[in-house]
């Protein structure tokens, strides 16, 4: 079989090598390579050795590959034909392959210069457009910011005025509340003697005093309230002590009169009459002390006895109420004070039980009267001791309300009950 002959002019390798772009590029690279070897002697020797090595390797490879190439020559011819056809199509589509490198570089430079001019013109126009746009935006933003600042300023001023109005309203409300509180304190806690003297000095001197602030008024009101409450509680303790002493003294006198009447019941008529007169005077004085001044009453012995026993019951009831109040307020105090308060309540209950159901002097024995007088003396001493401890050793914040509760009303109610009992007898 005859071998296929390949036209060297149609070899795809030769066609590629003869392309202007490839050949011109090869010339440029070759000239650069030669120039480099000439400029650098050491590099030239290395390059020459490398060239010799490449030639030797290439020669050996061609010698060993030649039999294979000869066997594959038909296939190579077919592949070369198809490659040449593909190269033809590439040359049609890419005219740049038939242009030398110098022309391509010149065209590229022209394109770059034109692009540069276009870009410069575009950038200048864009710069002007951006500058104009930015200027317009700045003007609009400035106008918007100015309007916003004015609106914000107006809103802030309105808010400040509203807050100031609320502060003024609250200040007025606080001032009114403090004024009412001061009036209530003056009403329920009157001025003490020291404060009255200070007020008198202020009036005499005509000192012009600047109106204090609300904080100062609140502090003054708190101090005034504590001070006046303390003095009022102290005066109530002293008043309770005085009333309890008077009650014990009256009860002691009543017991003594009952004892005197019992001992002289069977003596001479003048002694009986004297005892009755004393009892009657005691009855009238006691009624006047609680607000009654009715002297148009019977003066007989039975009425005198019942009235005297009514006095004793009322006085013992008052004393018992006082002792119960003392016992309640003694909670939390030292144990000896609490024990004394409890003992006071027990003794008051014993004395009250003596006169509670007695209808005449005969029902009250001499021994009971003597024992009652001894208990009254002990109660007076113990009550004085407990009251002195309250005044001198404890804060008076435990005193709330009247310490000696509504004695006048209790006396009047008791008197009405006792008068109804006398009328029934």
Swiss-Prot record:
Induction: By dexamethasone. InterPro entries: Perilipin (IPR004279). It is a peripheral membrane protein. GO terms for biological process: cellular response to glucose starvation; lipid droplet disassembly; lipid storage; long-chain fatty acid transport. SUPFAM superfamilies: Mannose-6-phosphate receptor binding protein 1 (Tip47), C-terminal domain. Keywords: Acetylation, Lipid droplet, Membrane, Phosphoprotein, Ubl conjugation. Acylated; primarily with C14, C16 and C18 fatty acids. The modification Phosphoserine is found at residue 213. Adipose tissue specific. Expressed abundantly and preferentially in fat pads. It is found in: Membrane; Lipid droplet. GO terms for cellular component: cytoplasm; cytosol; lipid droplet; nucleus; plasma membrane. Belongs to the perilipin family. Interacts with IRGC. This is Perilipin-2. It comes from Mus musculus (Mouse). The lineage of its organism: Eukaryota, Metazoa, Chordata, Craniata, Vertebrata. The gene is Plin2.
């Amino acid at each position: 079989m005859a071998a296929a002959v390949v036209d060297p002019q149609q070899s795809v390798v030769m066609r590629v090598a003869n392309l202007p772009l490839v050949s011109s590029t090869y010339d440029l690279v070759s000239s650069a390579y030669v120039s480099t070897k000439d400029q650098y002697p050491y590099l030239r020797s290395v390059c020459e050795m490398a060239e010799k090595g490449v030639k030797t390797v290439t020669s050996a490879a061609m010698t060993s590959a030649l039999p294979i190439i000869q066997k594959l020559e038909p296939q190579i011819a077919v592949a070369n034909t198809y490659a040449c056809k593909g190269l033809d199509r590439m040359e049609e589509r890419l005219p740049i392959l038939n242009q030398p490198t110098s022309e391509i570089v010149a065209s590229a430079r022209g394109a770059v210069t034109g692009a540069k001019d276009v870009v410069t013109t575009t950038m200048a126009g864009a710069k002007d457009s951006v500058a104009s746009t930015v200027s317009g935006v700045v003007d609009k933003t400035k106008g918007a910011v100015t309007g916003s600042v004015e609106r914000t300023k107006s809103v802030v001023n309105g808010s400040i005025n509203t807050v100031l109005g609320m502060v003024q309203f609250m200040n007025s409300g606080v001032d009114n509340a403090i004024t009412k509180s001061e009036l209530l304190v003056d009403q329920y806690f009157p001025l003490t003697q020291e404060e009255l003297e200070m007020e008198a000095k202020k009036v005499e001197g005509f000192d012009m005093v600047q109106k204090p602030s609300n904080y100062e008024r609140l502090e003054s009101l708190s101090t005034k309230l504590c001070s006046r409450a303390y003095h009022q509680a102290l005066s109530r303790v002293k008043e309770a002590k005085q009333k309890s002493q008077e009650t014990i003294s009256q009860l002691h006198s009543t017991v003594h009169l009952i004892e005197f009447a019992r001992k002289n019941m069977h003596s001479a008529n003048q002694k009986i009459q004297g005892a009755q007169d004393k009892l009657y005077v005691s009855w009238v004085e006691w009624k006047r002390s609680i607000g009654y001044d009715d002297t148009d009453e019977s003066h007989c012995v039975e009425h005198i006895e019942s009235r005297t026993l009514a006095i004793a019951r009322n006085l013992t009831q008052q004393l018992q109420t006082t002792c119960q109040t003392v016992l309640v307020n003694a909670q939390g105090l030292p144990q000896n004070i609490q024990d004394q308060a409890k003992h006071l309540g027990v003794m008051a209950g014993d004395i009250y039980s003596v006169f509670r159901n007695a209808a005449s002097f005969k029902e009250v024995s001499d021994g009971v009267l003597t024992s009652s007088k001894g208990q009254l003396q002990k109660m007076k001493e113990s009550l004085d001791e407990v009251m002195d401890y309250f005044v001198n050793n404890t804060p008076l914040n435990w005193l709330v309300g009247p310490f000696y509760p509504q004695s006048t009303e209790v006396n009047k109610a008791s008197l009405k009950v006792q008068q109804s009992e006398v009328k029934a007898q």
